[in-house]
Amino acid sequence: MKVKSILKHSRMSSPSLETDSMESGQQQNMVSSTPSIDMNESDCSGTGTPSEERIRRLRWDEENLSKAEQQKSAKMKITEPKTPFQRFLLPDDEVPEINLDETDSKDDFTAGTLGDTLGTLPSTRVSKDSKDDNVSFSSDKKQFYVKKEPFPVPCTEPTTSGDRYTVRMKAPTPKYSTDNHLPSKKELFPRETKPQVEVVHARINNPDDHLRTHPSVNNLGKDSDHADKMYNEGVILGEDEAMEEEALSEAEENIPKKKPDFNELRKKHYFAMAKPLKRDELESSGTESDLERDNSDSGSASDVNMNENE
């Protein structure tokens, strides 16, 4: 009883609370009524229910995602086709039979079907006429073969064939090519290293070999002083060295001849240019002398006439 009386007393005493409660209730009714109005407006617009709109948007997103994935995959994929693999199997009749037993001869193995199917392998033999390994020099008088080696191979004993042998000098290999260049004496015979004599066998077909097997001063070249010096020092040259010395001596003899030839040509050219000048000078001097003679003759004639008149 006391509680009710308190409530009644509170209601009677506070009319403002009732008005506040009424206003709050009206606001709740307005808020609850607003979505219903929006829904009705959306229905009236004709776009459809919100569930259908959401479904339509989801489909649109899915389509965009699928297109983006297709573009990415197209850029990342390799467009080159793969190499086709064709598996080829021989029939049983054409399969070669390989015997693992040892064969007595090579002809038995190559005569079978395996040799026919595989065919002959390319020959890997190197021809003897190859220019890289051996260099052959052929002429009417001599034929011998020279191998490319850094230094000549020394022989312990002199090898003879038919009482014929050649003596070659042991010297460092020259750094020049004998095709387009004539070596000098300094290149052939350096002062630092003393050449040593060494016997090397060579195959020579020359009827005049007895002149070369026993070298003399006359066979070493035209330069007698150089030949005497080499002969006294005990240096014996073979055929190649003698030929090189002869070529050097000929080249040295031809070098000083070029200067007088040039001087002679220059003198001839000078005299050829000077002759017409001399002729002009002589002619001019001749005309002057003729004029002087004419004047002197005319003067003498006038003197004679004057004397006669007197």
Curated annotation (Swiss-Prot):
Q: Which GO terms describe its biological process?
A: intracellular signal transduction; regulation of signal transduction
Q: Which GO terms describe its cellular component?
A: cytosol; nucleus
Q: Does the keyword Phosphoprotein apply?
A: yes
Basic residues: bias regions: 1-11
Biased composition, class Basic and acidic residues, residue ranges: 51-80, 126-150, 182-195, 254-265
The answer to whether the entry has keyword Phosphoprotein is: yes
Name the UniProt key words of this record, in alphabetical order. Phosphoprotein
Q: Name one GO molecular function term.
A: protein phosphatase inhibitor activity
Superkingdom of this entry's organism?
Answer: Eukaryota
Q: Where is this region: Disordered?
A: 1-227, 242-310
Residues bearing Phosphoserine are: 285
InterPro entries from the xrefs? PPI-2
Q: Where is the composition biased (Polar residues)?
A: 12-50, 297-310
Q: Where is the composition biased (Acidic residues)?
A: 91-105, 242-253
- Which stretches does UniProt call biased (Low complexity)? 110-121
This protein is called Uncharacterized protein C17A5.09c
Its taxonomic path starts at: Eukaryota, Fungi, Dikarya, Ascomycota, Taphrinomycotina
